[in-house]
C-alpha cells in the first residue's frame, strides 16, 4: 500500500509494458531508486484476479497450456525491461529489488547476423555492427517504444558511449552471453576507468556516470529521448 500521490509522482506504471508483464518489477525498481522504504507483511491478503487474462484462455489454447499470445507478450515485455534497465529482473530471496547502477553502454559487434542482432540489441544503449539492420528495425520497432533508428549504427560510426564493449559475435555461447546480464553489476563493482579484457570481450570504460535516476519518472527527459 502507498499513497496515490507517491504513485503519480513518478508517472505511475510505464506504458512500455502494456498490456502486461514486468510493469510491477519496473515500478518497484523505481520506488526503490526514489527512496521508498519497503515493508513486507505475512498478515496481509490480496486477491489476485486470476483467469482474467490470456495466459490460460481456453479460447486460445488447451486447458493448462500457456497461450501463444501470452508467451509472445511476456517475451516482448522482458526485452523492453532489459532495454530500459540494462539487465533482467533482479531481486533478493524476499523479493526486494536489486537495482544496479545504470551505465551508458555501446556494443561493437563484428561477424554479426540478424539472429545475433536480435539477441544483442536489448542489452545495450547503442550497437555498432557490420550487419545490415534496416530489416530488423522494420520487424522489431512495433514491439518497443525505444527508438531503434537511434540505437543501431554502422560499425564504422563514431563510438560515443561511456562504456564500449567490443567482441566477435560469432564467438558468443550460452555461457559467455550471461556476461551481458551481469555487466552493469560488474561495472559498478569494479569502479575502474580504462581498458580491460574478459573472455571474448574488450571493454573500454570512459566514464561511469550512473543514469539510474533518469528511469524513476517515466517523463524524465533522459528516458524520453530514447523513445520514439
For the regions a protein language model found, what residue spans apply to each?
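C-terminal, non-catalytic tails of nucleotide-sugar-dependent glycosyltransferases
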Residues: 1, 37-38, 54-115, 119-130, ...
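A short, conserved alpha-helix in the catalytic core of glycosyltransferases
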Residues: 1-11, 16-45
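Short, solvent-exposed loop/turn segments at secondary-structure junctions
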Residues: 7, 45-46, 114-115, 133-135, ...
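Alpha-helical elements of Rossmann-like donor-binding domains used by nucleotide-donor carbohydrate transfer enzymes
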Residues: 26-30, 76, 80, 182
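Histidine-centered active-site/metal-ligand motif
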Residues: 48-50
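Short, well-ordered secondary-structure micro-motifs within conserved domains or adaptor modules
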Residues: 153-188, 200-201
